[in-house]
Amino acid sequence: MKVAFCSSEVVPFAKTGGMADVCGALPLALEQLGQQIIIILPFYRGIDSKKYGIKKINEHCSTTKIGKSVQVYFIDHPVYFERDGLYGDNKGDFSDNLERFQYFCWQALKILKQVDSKVDIVHCHDWQTALIPAYLTFPLKGDGFYQEMKTVFTVHNLAYQGIFPKTEFPKLKLDRKLFEREGFEFYDQINLLKGGIIYSDRVTTVSKQYAREIQTQKLWCGLDGVLRSRKDLVVGILNGIDYEVWDPQNDPWIEKNFSWEDIEGKYINKNYLQEYFKFPNQKEAPLFGFVGRLSYQKGLDLVCEAIDEIGRMDLQLVFLGVGEKKYHKLIKDMASRYSQKIAVHLKYDERMAHMVYAGSDLFLMPSVYEPCGLSQMISLRYGTIPLVFKTGGLADTITSFDSADGQGNGFVFTKYDKESFVDAVKAAVKAYKDKKIFSKLVQRAFQFRFSWKDSAKQYIALYEQCLSNHN
């Protein structure tokens, strides 16, 4: 089977979020399972041609390889992509994003023909590639080269929909009749994500629970009705993590490598964090870590609301990340008030991220919603116990630990309010104080695996269903 991945960001070339990790790792996992894979993405200014061995094919396209045989094509345009930033700058989103990604979608399909790569599946990701299913359904339908191609459309985060004024619809190269309720129209505006959902052959998202949630009004994103109308074609497939990058036994970023059989290194990493953040060296106080974007989605409002209760507990808490200025200020204020217990590192630092995963006892992830989440999987890999709200991928990967039967791998609260959150933190601190119980929990954490190979097998089954035309 031959599959083309079309994405606006792909690791290691360009990244703003988790979609880039998926579009870098999943193609390699599919290749290892015998599939022929190509990747198409924009040729942004920040991509280093020399570093990645990128060669020019023609005026609009360059190429390189990753893995053993995954061919990567870069769509070039001197105006659209020769600028800093993928989607915007410090002033906000680029005003021509609709034109930029319309061009990318159209050129991606043209490149397939130019390099004579007749694929079986075109796998599209988020609103930036949402025009591709519509192009294959309408203007290119009569072209024999494209006629048999099927589309899979993955929604990584329903909150980002690609909404533009209706006056820009003529720029899409689509019949005006597609600007309708059953098409791209959304409250008298263009909604690209909606079009991708409607015109693709299959829709996936990044966890089973999130696939259920986006079909309800719970997330208030406005597309629940559209998704319910295609419910038989919507599938949740959990993302994986790279077990070579996130490996406590061989991680070059941490102070001391460790494993479940030789756990002492974990305590050395904890001591390093305590010294670095000028905490008292208290082995009996659990150290909670947070790595992520400082935003509403990640539950920072709830943490701020509960900070006085948390500040009175015997614990330590480290925040690592960047985000909205509002949360920068709130978290710095918390760290100032509880300087012996709370610290903040307001930048994304790869080494420090690995250190927080490795040296923390528990990992704080009270997200309001979380399509998949990778941090909880990474923390388990390092024997660091997640504390999460039951939503999206967190619900699919973390279950409450029961000391009676030894089941579960974290601490979960199911009602999104201060009291439930504080109760979960108290339960985690109490469990940590019981060394026998917590040791058992850490041992269980090391046993969980979320590999890309497992995810890739599910995608192959989905591609095969798509090609067989069986719903």
Predicted regions located by residue number:
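Catalytic cores of nucleotide-sugar-dependent glycosyltransferases that transfer UDP/GDP/TDP-activated
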Residues: M1-N471
